[in-house]
Amino acid sequence: MESSPPPPPPTITVQVKFGGRTIPVEVPAAATAADLKRLLQPLTNVLPRGQRLICKGKVLADAASLSSMQVVNGSKVMLMASQGLHQGDGPITKNSSVPAPSTRRASNVKEAQIQKSDTNVSKIRPERWKATGIIALSDSSLKAVPEEVWGCGSSIRVLDVSNNCIEAIPQEIAALRSLQKLILTANDIADGNISWEGLTCVQTLTVLSLSQNRLVTLPSSLGSITHLRELRIANNRLENLPVEIGLLKHLEILIANNNRITSLPSSIGGCESLNEVDLSSNLLAELPEAFGNLQHLKALSVRNNGLTSLPSAFFIKCSQLITLDLHGTEITNDVLRQVDGWEEFDERRRKKHQKQLDFRVGSSVVFDEGADDDYRRL
């Protein structure tokens, strides 16, 4: 006769008050305050290091069990958050809201219409665009890319339609087969409304900016734009990056801050030319070990993420790194100084900034070590 599985450990539900709302959290009865903080991180976006839990007027000590501090089923706990110690865009509160991109665009367009009359593209001579190779239509109250643009064909090197209300990029983008820079920042482009098939036909493209749109995913076909050197996808709602991003061997700059990215594919190690990466204000808990393959990396910002450690031998492998921003993560200066290769990294960045240090004015100018001090005991 088979023995029955052991019963699950007993649990309690704690009512946590934070940001104008009450959050019920189920935890094992034997849990510690540190365990409760880890459970609260995805529910509040506040890093455990930035949480102070108070029950019945007493601060809960991390290492102590909840039961030893008289926290029982139904207990009410108040969460106080340290400023700046959060992942993503900020702590999740009752009144947290991000204005819909379409609302923001509509407001921008309305202001533009007040300041100037609508751009009458039909009166703009496409011949001038062809002569200069540049189409500059930013802040032009556009809801779509004008048809006249596609007729310019291979004459165009730069297309800038940023800060409009454009909702789609059609297949006709393929007609701009000599395009090098495509600036689509601050529009209303959502998943499925951009012809990636058309974009992959533009093999001359080196700069693509899709920041401040409504993207949730990027397709695998992104990896087919093989000459891309700069990719800007900040301020969207991206939850991940496609595995195929590792095919972008020439990519030098990746700006993907203020999204909802929870993990990175290990294939990112294939982006061997990367020298600047901004992944700040996302939901990352770790960086893949393959980050160590980025031997040309000079600047990395992962501010306001849930990171607790760096890849092994990160400082040793990324031997050109001189700028690192880990503020608002679980990695403090004390932790950072224990990482192998930190001394060499510190020497490189201090050498770069030596002139600033030599000519600093007053005692308030302090060299930024790249991470926070440990606030846990404040």
Swiss-Prot record:
The lineage of its organism: Eukaryota, Viridiplantae, Streptophyta, Embryophyta, Tracheophyta. The keyword Repeat applies. The gene is IRL8. PANTHER family: PTHR48051, RAS SUPPRESSOR PROTEIN 1. Residues 93-106 have a biased composition (Polar residues). Residues 85-120 are annotated as: Disordered. It comes from Oryza sativa subsp. japonica. Widely expressed except in panicles. Belongs to the SHOC2 family. Disruption phenotype: No visible phenotype. InterPro entries: Leu-rich_rpt (IPR001611), Leu-rich_rpt_typical-subtyp (IPR003591), LRR_dom_sf (IPR032675), LRR_domain-containing (IPR050216), LRR_R13L4/SHOC2-like (IPR055414), Ubiquitin-like_dom (IPR000626), Ubiquitin-like_domsf (IPR029071). GO terms for biological process: intracellular signal transduction. Leucine-rich repeat protein that likely mediates protein interactions, possibly in the context of signal transduction. Keywords: Leucine-rich repeat, Repeat. This is Plant intracellular Ras-group-related LRR protein 8. LRR repeats lie at residues 129-152, 153-176, 178-201, 202-225, 226-250, 252-271, 272-293, 294-317, 319-344. Residues 10-86 form the Ubiquitin-like domain. It holds the Pfam family ubiquitin.
